[in-house]
Amino acid sequence: MRTTYLAKPGEVERKWYIVDATDIPLGRLSTVVASILRGKNKPTFTPNVDTGDFVIVINAEKIKLTGRKATGKIYYHHTLHPGGIKSKTAGEMREKTPERLIETSIKGMLPHNTLGRKQALKLHVYAGSEHNQQAQNPEKLDITNLI
């Protein structure tokens, strides 16, 4: 007799949360958001089922990078052409594409498989304070007490 509850994909209830990234360290924000995207904050967490909630991150341009990460942390990507490796520092990414900086950080904390890619689709990041998910009535989540 099995007494462990295993969630089924059809019976998962999802909520929308909104998180303000102003003056919060990038790694601390990313761990909390990745945990919510996976559903680890729920008692019905099941590792092989997407039980997570939707998360909207606003004010990505005001994220805090501690220490020397603004100049010392380098992100690489390849253009798929010979000799096409490109690099940007975390400070440059925060200035030009702050959404991409947060998305990259959070996606690195999710599982590296099809389930993780599905969970990453529930993340919405905006550089400013405006977002276009008002119809979902997101619940404001204060993560300062969670970090």
Swiss-Prot record:
Answer whether the UniProt record assigns the keyword Ribonucleoprotein to this protein.
yes
Q: Which domain of life is it from?
A: Bacteria
GO cellular component terms listed in the entry, alphabetical order: cytosolic large ribosomal subunit
Q: Which UniProt keywords apply?
A: Ribonucleoprotein, Ribosomal protein
CDD domains found in the cross-reference section: Ribosomal_L13
- Does 4Fe-4S show up as a keyword for this record? no
Its Gene Ontology molecular function terms?
Answer: mRNA binding; structural constituent of ribosome
GO BP, one annotated term:
translation
What's the stated role of this polypeptide? This protein is one of the early assembly proteins of the 50S ribosomal subunit, although it is not seen to bind rRNA by itself. It is important during the early stages of 50S assembly.
Q: Which family does it belong to?
A: Belongs to the universal ribosomal protein uL13 family.
Q: How does it assemble?
A: Part of the 50S ribosomal subunit.
Name by which UniProt lists this protein: Large ribosomal subunit protein uL13
Species name for this entry?
Pediococcus pentosaceus (strain ATCC 25745 / CCUG 21536 / LMG 10740 / 183-1w)
Name the gene behind this protein: rplM
